[in-house]
Amino acid sequence: MHRRSFLYRTALVSIGSFLPFWTRAGSTEIPSWESLVDWARWAPSVHNLQAHRLKIVSETEAVLCYDPKFLLPVGDPNSDFNTAVMGVFTESLSIAAAHYGFAVRKTEIIGKLDHTMEEIMPFARIELVPAQRKEPLSRQLLKDRRTSRNNYDGKPLSALTLNACEDIVNAFEGQFFSSEDEDLIDYLIKINQESLFEDLNSQPMREELDGLFRYSKKEAETHRTGLWTKCMGFPGKLVKSVFRHHNRWVKGARKQMLKQYYRGTFSGTATVGWIQYPWTTNEDKFEFGRMLCRIWMQMANDDAYMHPFGNLITNPSAFEKMNNTLELNKESAAPLAFAFRAGYSKQPPRSFRIPTNKIILS
């Protein structure tokens, strides 16, 4: 097991104060918000629901909004993780803007994500400013990045990638850990599997997930939001049966078959990682999202994939087991905020996205 040191290794991932920098010598072109959203819309979001919306105020100012229809009253009742996604989307806009020598930054959080709202609501003000530094992450990574939920090839994540990810976390004042210990990996996969079946036993959770799964390419292409079962590595008919005929899968041979099938999608996992990060305020969660975006893009840059262990964070019993098992900095008040597996696999399918003109508000 490895705990990465608290050192900034290179300027590659420095997130410090900006000083003017132009990626194109002499360029004064201000990119349109539409052009930036066209790249940033490929950013990851919770269950691919894409709640983010953008209200343009001027060529350099906008209001980041959210559509409450795409929040999760059961799975994310306080919208903690969707708040983080607002940070992911903002950082994606910034990476896209770097192509023109600009960056996008949040100036003020003006609202709180609330699934009880009935209309699109504001969350934060953002602005387009001259970049302070050269952006090491290409905007093409926003489209190249994918989540691989399939089996990996058994190779541990490279030390260079782990070091780069640690530097990113350090720059955001978090703490990064990773492990290649086979027993620990097997244990995390085991409790992840247990938490899945525990969640499936909850009718409200089943109904919420059933409403966001897309069981065929036609459904996925029509909605352009939600979890396409092909991206989950499961046949659509199987997943639909599990959610809509749950009693058939709670015992006996079918339950064992489902367990083995799900376990098989984790084969070849040779690296797991986790992050301690402040998780009290909306600012904390937003900044976590910015950090997570950069980690994910770094993985894509290095031809690696990451698969978050979402259940291990949101399921209380699984979280307690994991929290009591993993190496953590006990002197830090920051909680365990994120866990994942990472490695190398065949290129997974890409989820659909809603078009730019649906994200930008009129």
PLM regions with names:
Residues 2-362:
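Acidic, surface-exposed loops and disordered segments
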